[in-house]
Structures are given as C-alpha cells and as structure tokens.
Amino acid sequence: MKLLLAGLLLAGCALAETWSYWIEPCTAELAKQSGCTSADAELGVWALEAWQKASAGELRVAAASEEDRARIRIYWAWGTQSLYGEARSIVVDGRRGAAIFVIPDMARLGPDIDAVAKRDPLFRDTVVYLTCVHESGHAIGLPHTAQFADIMYSFGFGGDIVEYFGRYRRALASRQSIPDHSGISPADRDKLVAIFKK
C-alpha cells in the first residue's frame, strides 16, 4: 500500500509543469541603485512558491542553475515613479517565460507608500512580496483584473493603493508569516488552475 501511495505521489509530481526561476542577487552596488536588500530574494521565492501551492499540483517551481536557463527571472530595478513592477515576455528553450522587474525602493512609489514603509519595515516587505506575486502571475499567464480583492488587480482601476497593501500587512504577525498568507484570492486561484487545465 505504501509503495502504491508513493507511486501515485511521484506520478502527480511528474504531471506538474515545472517553471525554473532565477533571482538577481542584491549586491552592494545594486542596493545603492535600486534599494534592494539581500533578504528580498527570499520574498521572490515565497511569491513563486505561493503560486505553486495555489495551483492544485499543476505547477512546480525550481531554482535554475543559471540565469539564462530560468523561465522566470526576477530583477531589482529602479525607474519610473509609481511603477511597482513589470513582466516582459521571454522564450526559454521554446517555452514561455518572463523577465520580471520589481522596484524595491519605496521612495520611487510615491510619498504615501514611502511614508508608511518608513514607519513599518514589514509594510515595505509586503509591497515587494505582493509585487513579486503579481508580476510572476503575469509570467505564468494571468491577466489583470478589476477586482480589488485579487492579486492580479490593476492599479489602473484606482482605489486606495495604500490600503491594498495595508490589509495584507495587517494579517502578518512577522516577516516569517508571509508564506502563510499568499495574497492570492480564490478567483486568482481558479484562473491559475484553468490555465493548466487547457
């Protein structure tokens, strides 16, 4: 019986689509330019693992040995004010992927976000984490939505953006509780599973 269960588990793993990833190390020079921290890579990993958990066994994420082998690549960027992140399509070994650019410097995201982040470092981690989740959702194939509850909500629809992040922040007891709160809504989850059922 144990062998049968083990076989079924292995078969389930084999059916999952693997998405390899690579996350840019935050060097001292990059930290000065972008505002990243060495701990931000962990937020990126948690974001990808959140999609894995939400996929009902359809998606598996795994670290790539090299940047150019990764289907999802996360970079710490700096640039246009109020642009939280961006996902640009790439093709890796004939398979769809994305280069993701995340802005970790709260000062570039406007005075309201910056003011809260300065008072509360965990709010800053919330913004970086949820941006990683949102942009990696695009990488996997999820579009924007107009529903404020969704991680794939587009800020182009307006709303209280500080509160968008604030409601998530209030669910956290500490940074280490982030993996327990994916930020992914039931509607996001349904759309994710539908992608892999096609």
Please report, for each region that a protein language model flagged, where it lies by residue.
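Sec-dependent N-terminal signal peptides
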Residues: 3-12
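Fold-level signature of zinc-dependent metallopeptidase catalytic domains
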Residues: 17-45
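Short boundary motifs at domain starts and secondary-structure transition points
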Residues: 12-16, 64
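Metzincin-family zinc-dependent endopeptidase catalytic domain
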Residues: 40-147, 157
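Metalloprotease/metallohydrolase-associated module, dominated by Zn2+-dependent proteases
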Residues: 98-119, 127, 143-198
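Hydrophobic beta-strand segments of well-ordered beta-sheets in folded domains
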Residues: 16-21, 72, 150
